[in-house]
């Protein structure tokens, strides 16, 4: 009871007093000649989610300013696409957010298909959604595991990568690759599912649904250290999240029920029953709850895909040489980190005139500059876990 009362008091104080009140009073600073400290964190740092550099200004252990510096993994992806044929761009998208390869391929193919006006076979649409939801699980669970690992807990990351490994085995059986799939193609998918895979996936999600509570929820939510390190950290309001253009779990953890799958439906999502998971706290703990509940929703979607998937072809009427008419195509999907959108401009040739990617990791990184100040230095890792950026996404 005392612990709950203490927590309630701390939350009340946090609501009344902004985090910046931890800073040393300016009068005291002038009297004693105190100075802030500039410190670099990264780009080579095991907890930076990739090649990211944070320039920090510290007042003791309190963050005064945080400037993210990106570009260490920039590969000119959009420019390279201008010199590739339309199908040859698909392998490049796998190298963007490498924890959401299927979603990247799907978003790009939707944009080109928008230009072509091609009809996708129903079976291919269900296979696309099936693969993307497996990919979402294979991203969310490691994200949770990484968050706990950065807080000092080792066991959840082992359970998370056990599940990711099993899903990658399915990907390998279907696509021939474990990460860079090149599976979703313009007009459909590369190949049909092997005959034994649907039953194996069904058995897997049945077992996963039973394992989530003991292996993740019970292990994490009863951990006092996790609660102390995540509750109230980087608390976002709905207005702040919308103003920053956040999408995905960082937005939905504030209570904004925006999901591209429902609000701008694509593929066969309108035919599937699922809930848009939200929370109201807007902090790191809330983002964890959103991700773990979305795993349950992905399991629900996977079951429906396996039940409703019709027989038939898996590729539409698209020639080997793709040459869309002049114009612009747009595709958007709901990736694990938020809205992934692709804008393709065609000049009538077999190579794109312009390709632009809107990756959620890049947009959501704005949160660091806005919400880091006022928090303590050790809070950087939980806040990074809220954003869950991937360097292949923010650097294209």
UniProtKB/Swiss-Prot annotation:
Gene Ontology, cellular component aspect: plasma membrane
Catalytic reaction list: a quinone + NADH + 5 H(+)(in) = a quinol + NAD(+) + 4 H(+)(out)
EC number: 7.1.1.-
GO molecular function: NAD binding; NADH:ubiquinone reductase (non-electrogenic) activity; quinone binding
Membrane topology, as annotated: Peripheral membrane protein
Cellular compartments annotated: Cell membrane
Keywords: Cell membrane, Membrane, NAD, Quinone, Translocase, Transport
Alphabetized InterPro entries for the sequence: NADH_Q_OxRdtase_suD, NDH1_su_D/H, NiFe-Hase_large
Similarity annotation: Belongs to the complex I 49 kDa subunit family.
HAMAP family: NDH1_NuoD
Its job: NDH-1 shuttles electrons from NADH, via FMN and iron-sulfur (Fe-S) centers, to quinones in the respiratory chain. The immediate electron acceptor for the enzyme in this species is believed to be a menaquinone. Couples the redox reaction to proton translocation (for every two electrons transferred, four hydrogen ions are translocated across the cytoplasmic membrane), and thus conserves the redox energy in a proton gradient.
Subunit text: NDH-1 is composed of 14 different subunits. Subunits NuoB, C, D, E, F, and G constitute the peripheral sector of the complex.
Annotated protein name in UniProt: NADH-quinone oxidoreductase subunit D
Lineage: Bacteria, Bacillati, Actinomycetota, Rubrobacteria, Rubrobacterales
């Amino acid at each position: 009871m005392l612990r709950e009362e203490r927590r309630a008091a701390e939350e009340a104080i946090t609501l009344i007093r902004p985090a910046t009140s931890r800073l040393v009073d300016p009068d005291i600073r002038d009297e004693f000649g105190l100075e802030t400290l500039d410190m670099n964190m990264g780009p080579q740092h095991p907890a930076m989610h990739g090649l990211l550099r944070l320039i920090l200004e510290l007042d003791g252990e309190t963050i005064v300013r945080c400037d993210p510096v990106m570009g260490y993994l920039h590969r000119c992806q959009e420019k390279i696409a201008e010199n590739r044929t339309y199908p040859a761009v698909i392998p490049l998208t796998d190298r963007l957010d490498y924890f959401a390869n299927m979603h990247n391929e799907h978003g790009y193919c939707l944009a080109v298909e928008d230009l072509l006006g091609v009809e996708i076979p129903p079976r291919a649409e269900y296979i696309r959604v099936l693969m993307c939801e497996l990919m979402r699980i294979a991203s969310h669970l490691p994200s949770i595991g990484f968050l706990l690992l950065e807080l000092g807990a080792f066991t959840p990351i082992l359970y998370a990568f056990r599940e990711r490994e099993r899903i990658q085995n399915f990907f390998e059986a279907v696509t021939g690759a474990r990460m860079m799939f090149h599976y979703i193609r313009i007009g459909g998918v590369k190949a049909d599912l092997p005959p034994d895979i649907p039953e194996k996936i069904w058995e897997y999600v049945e077992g996963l649904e039973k394992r989530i509570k003991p292996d993740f929820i019970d292990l994490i939510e009863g951990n006092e250290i996790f609660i102390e390190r995540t509750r109230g950290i980087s608390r976002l309001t709905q207005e702040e999240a919308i103003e920053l253009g956040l999408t995905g779990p960082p937005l939905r953890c504030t209570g904004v029920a925006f999901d591209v799958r429902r609000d701008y439906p694509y593929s066969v999502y309108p035919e599937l029953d699922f809930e848009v998971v939200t929370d109201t706290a807007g902090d790191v703990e809330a983002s964890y709850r959103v991700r773990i509940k979305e795993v349950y929703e992905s399991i629900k979607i996977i079951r429906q895909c396996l039940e409703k998937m019709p027989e038939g072809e898996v590729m539409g009427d698209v020639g080997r040489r793709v040459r869309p008419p002049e114009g612009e195509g747009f595709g958007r999907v709901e990736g694990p980190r938020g809205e992934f959108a692709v804008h393709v401009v065609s000049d009538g040739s077999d190579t794109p005139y312009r390709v632009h990617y809107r990756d959620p990791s890049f947009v959501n990184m704005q949160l660091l500059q806005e919400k880091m100040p006022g928090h303590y230095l050790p809070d950087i890792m939980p806040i990074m876990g809220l954003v869950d950026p991937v360097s292949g996404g923010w650097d294209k």
